[in-house]
From Swiss-Prot:
Xref: InterPro entries: UPF0182 (IPR005372)
Tagged with keyword Ribosomal protein: no
HAMAP family: UPF0182 (MF_01600)
Protein name stated in the entry: UPF0182 protein Ppro_3567
Location within or outside the cell: Cell membrane
Organism of derivation: Pelobacter propionicus (strain DSM 2379 / NBRC 103807 / OttBd1)
Family classification: Belongs to the UPF0182 family.
This protein's record includes keyword Cell membrane: yes
GO CC annotation terms, alphabetical: extracellular region; plasma membrane
Transmembrane segments annotated in the record for this chain: 15-35, 60-80, 112-132, 174-194, 210-230, 257-277, 282-302
Length: 900
């Protein structure tokens, strides 16, 4: 039995290194295969230089950090392993039961320590490789031309140098501690450190070696204190961000003293360890710790409580100003022009007629109901899916129109027959778009279309010549095109229409090596064995547009809402906004994720058919993008090179204005005293439990001659519901990117969205109608409440949708309009406006609020009331509850007139 166990043990000992070697080789092969497939992808998209630059940076950073650790640790282990100590042959403490004596352990010391240091070097190298962007930033850094107001460093130091210095500091400390720990372990094994009954006995050679490491570590700690002084500029001081009075007059001074004192204390500690004078050794770090606690923790609290708190406004004013200036720069708020908006309620029917383009482009269709409606009317087959609806503007039949557009993508989860050939060779792409106006409604309450169906039927001068969507938001799987199997294009009544890919996207499958590579990458032997794949075939992967652009440019932050446009040639192109950002701008207030600097510097375009990607520079003044341009000179193109037909569809990002609005609500106050007292703090209105979001519309801005596409968001004063201002970002050239804040008089009440919402909820007629619809089994869905500035007045518009149930088809059945004290609900926007402003006679409809008295006599009014009552009773018997409710509303108005 014992012999058998011995043989098993010998076999394990023999094959264990082989298993490790095989595992390492397999991991290496897998890594190289992925690396090669990534290179093929970058080569296909024309960005191979980005791949090589990134690869060199990651490799260089990994070798630098890992190599430094391995070299430093090996030098220290070499010194430790050369040392000779007595007492060889004695059992190690705690290892006697294992049968390990010191001689055996000493022989294992070198290989084990080598292995451990190699593993630690791999860890450090991996951490270093993750800092490749910081390394490239440092190597290509630029000056901004603006210095921080406290230390006087150029802002470029914080953006491009400090991140790498922080990483070097952290890795340096880890390297020194790793060397000290491994050297200590070797000394213990070799007998340089003994555990005796009287305590720990440390040989003189060991003490000298560790003393040197302690001195080096003290220098690393001092460097850390030096870098920590810069981080004071990111401090959260409650009322503002950045270094304040206490930071400047206590913590900054302490960090500077500690930076100078810590190396001296480290030298004292090293000398104490070298000589074995432990009191001297412990005194030095005790002084540093005491000074740190006193200057960083204790004294700042005392200073804050007894000096700053009673005089905070006076003492913190210059630092508040620093915070205001930096935050306005960080979020590009300086470009926002503030304009007074002297609102009135004098809007007339003539004004409505003069702003016809604005009225016709008020968005009545909400994204969620429209997406559900599109899905039920235009999905065509279960394997097609509408993922999102986007806003844009086009010249449609000669009119500048806001439209809603949704791509019809392929949903692999809903394929009727799931097998490899169907999923990878036949069903390869989505097909076409659904495209319609934002405000037009059919008699049934359904959206109208400019482009619909498969193949695309265009009811306007918008033509889609290349409707296939190979690259989209739902294209998460690889496909192989140009095979012997025809691709499915679209269904017809007589059968399916097929197609063959004619684009240049994807990687050619022109060799056995590539087939083997992708078979391994996607873990299927079918790619290697399929006879349908020829040398002309191409494999399309990274087809999800979000994944695609993030793979190419992971250093950019991309918007979560790509939108599809139709260019002049009828091709479908995705436009995705890209941002540069940083967490390192001094004194700037951060977002929740830590970002305190952001610019929309890049517009990304992806062709939905061939997957080609272009990055266009939309903000050439952004210093971070300038550094990216130095790192990747072939990545970005000037905005002037973007085709003119695509530039017409560039829009100001919803996400960016949302961020800027959140900051501008506070940082429009540029006077430190007003800022400190929050005298004019704004908020983004909240309806229900959700804050309003910016929305696109076409309108004529005050003082402008023509309508334009804008992004708009209102503000209310803090903890109040009336309007304070509205923010607008312009989207059309040549005014693109200009932002205005139109402010209302503070001494007048201007109804805000929440107040209008409350009035709608309290309106007896609207409540009655909602109740009637509910009793009939319909679900009423109130759409977004929009504020529409026209001339010097404000209109509020809210659509009302009806659905048979939660899964039913939403129909736009009513439009609610509020103006001043008037509130109406009608079947469409035109009728609602006619009820308020007059003009063409509208059908009898609901209206509430102040209206002009008629000259009718009481007898005439009484006859009219009786007539309306009889009509209402007839409608009630017929079960026409909607018309019945309208007649009751009209009766209510007549009775009110009679009462007056």
């Amino acid at each position: 039995m014992g012999t058998l166990l011995l043989e098993v043990t010998m076999l394990k000992n023999k094959f264990f290194p082989l298993l490790i070697l095989v595992s390492v080789l397999l991991s290496l092969i897998s890594y190289l295969l992925n690396l090669y497939s990534d290179w093929l992808f970058f080569d296909e998209t024309g960005f191979s230089s980005v791949f090589t630059t990134t690869l060199y940076a990651k490799t260089g950073a990994g070798l630098l950090f890992g190599g430094l650790l391995f070299l430093f640790v090996q030098i220290n282990l070499h010194v430790a392993n050369r040392a000779q100590f007595p007492l060889s042959g004695m059992h190690l403490l705690g290892a006697g039961n294992l049968g390990i004596n010191r001689d055996q352990a000493v022989r294992l010391c070198k290989p084990v320590s080598m292995l451990v240091s190699f593993v630690l070097a791999l860890l450090a190298g991996n951490l270093g490789a993750m800092k490749w962007k910081d390394l490239l930033f440092f190597a290509n850094r630029l000056t901004v031309g603006t210095v921080d107001p406290l230390i006087g460093k150029d802002v470029g130091f914080y953006l491009f140098s400090l991140p790498l210095l922080d990483a070097v500091k952290g890795v340096s400390g880890f390297i020194i501690l790793a060397a000290a720990a491994l050297a200590t372990a070797v000394y213990y094994v070799r007998g340089g450190i003994l555990l005796t009954e009287r305590g720990v006995a440390i040989d003189e050679k060991v003490r000298r070696h560790l003393a040197v490491l302690v001195g080096i570590f003290a220098c690393a700690v001092a460097a850390g204190f030096y870098l920590d002084s810069f981080k004071l500029l990111y401090a959260d001081n409650g009322a503002f961000y950045g270094a304040g009075y206490v930071d400047v007059n206590s913590r900054l001074l302490t960090y500077r003293v500690l930076t100078f004192l810590t190396p001296l204390a480290g030298a004292m500690l090293a000398i104490g360890i070298w000589k074995g004078v432990w009191r001297m050794a412990l005194l030095a770090p005790a002084i540093v710790v005491a000074l740190y606690m006193l200057g960083i923790r204790v004294y700042p609290g005392v200073l804050q409580k007894f000096k700053v708190a009673p005089n905070e406004m006076a003492l913190e004013t210059p630092y508040i100003m620093n915070n205001i200036t930096a935050t306005r720069f960080g979020y590009d708020l300086e470009k926002i022009e503030t304009v007074p908006f002297d609102v009135d309620t004098k809007l007339t029917a003539a004004d409505i007629a003069n702003n016809d383009a604005t009225i016709k482009n008020i968005r009545l269709w909400d994204h969620a109901p429209l997406l559900k409606t599109y899905s039920q009317l235009q999905q065509i087959r279960t394997y097609y899916k509408f993922f999102d609806v986007d806003n844009d503007r086009y010249m449609v039949n000669g009119r500048y129109s806001q439209v809603m557009l949704s791509p019809r993508e392929l949903s692999y989860a809903d394929l009727p027959s799931k097998n490899w050939i169907n999923e990878r060779l036949i069903f390869t792409h989505g097909n076409g778009i659904t495209f319609g106006p934002v405000s037009r409604i059919s008699k049934e309450g359904l959206p109208e279309f400019f482009v619909k169906d498969i193949p695309a039927v265009s009811l306007a001068d918008i033509k889609v010549s290349r409707p296939e969507i190979y690259y989209g938001e739902l294209s998460n799987e690889y496909v192989i095109v140009k095979t012997n199997v025809p691709e499915f294009s679209y269904p017809t009544a007589t059968g399916n229409i097929t197609t063959t890919y004619a684009g240049t996207g994807g990687v050619p499958m022109d060799s056995l090596l590539k087939k083997a590579l992708f078979a391994a990458k996607f873990r299927t032997e079918k790619i290697l064995l399929s006879s349908d794949i020829t040398k002309e075939s191409r494999i399309l992967y990274n087809r999800n547009i979000n994944e695609r652009i993030r793979t190419i440019a992971p250093f950019l932050h991309f918007d979560s809402d790509p939108y599809l446009v139709v260019d002049q040639k009828g091709r479908l192109k995705w436009i995705i906004d890209a941002y540069t950002h940083s967490t390192r701008l001094p004194y700037s207030r951060p977002l929740k994720g830590g970002i305190n600097y952001i610019r929309n510097s890049v517009k990304t375009v992806v062709d939905a058919y061939d997957g080609s990607v272009d990055f266009y520079i939309s903000d050439p003044d952004d210093v971070i993008l300038k550094v990216h341009g130095r790192i990747f000179p072939k990545l970005f193109k000037p905005m002037a090179e973007m085709p003119g037909d695509l530039r017409k569809h560039v829009r100001y990002p919803h996400h960016l204005l949302q961020i800027q609005a959140a900051m501008f609500a506070t940082y429009h106050m540029t006077d430190p005293k007003v800022f400190y007292n929050k005298e004019n703090l704004w908020e983004i209105p909240v309806l229900g439990d959700k804050a309003m979001e910016p929305y696109y519309t076409i309108m004529k801005l005050p003082g402008e001659k023509a309508e334009e596409y804008i992004l708009l968001l209102p503000f209310t004063p803090s903890k109040r519901d009336n309007l304070a201002a509205w923010l607008t970002a312009r989207c059309d050239e040549p005014q693109y990117g200009k932002i205005r804040a139109y402010t209302f008089p503070r001494d007048r009440l201007i109804y805000g969205p929440k107040q209008i919402d409350a009035r709608i909820n309290q309106d007896s007629f609207i409540s009655q109608q909602l109740t009637l619809w509910s009793q009939r089994g319909s679900e009423a869905i109130r759409g977004s409440l929009l504020v529409i500035p026209i001339e010097k007045s404000l209109l509020y518009v809210q659509p009302l949708f009806l659905a048979a149930d939660k899964a039913g088809l939403p129909e736009l059945k009513r439009v609610i309009v509020a103006f001043g004290d008037q509130l109406v609900m009608e079947e469409n926007l035109e009728l609602a406006l006619q009820r308020i402003f007059g003009g063409k006679k509208a059908a009898p409809a609901a209206t509430s609020g102040v209206s002009a008295d008629t000259q009718a006599s009481p007898a005439t009014l009484a006859k009219e009331a009786v007539s309306i009552y009889e009509k209402a009773i007839t409608l009630q018997r017929q079960g026409n509850w909607a018309a019945y409710g309208e007649e009751l509303r009209s009766l209510e108005q007549i009775l009110k007139k009679m009462a007056r």
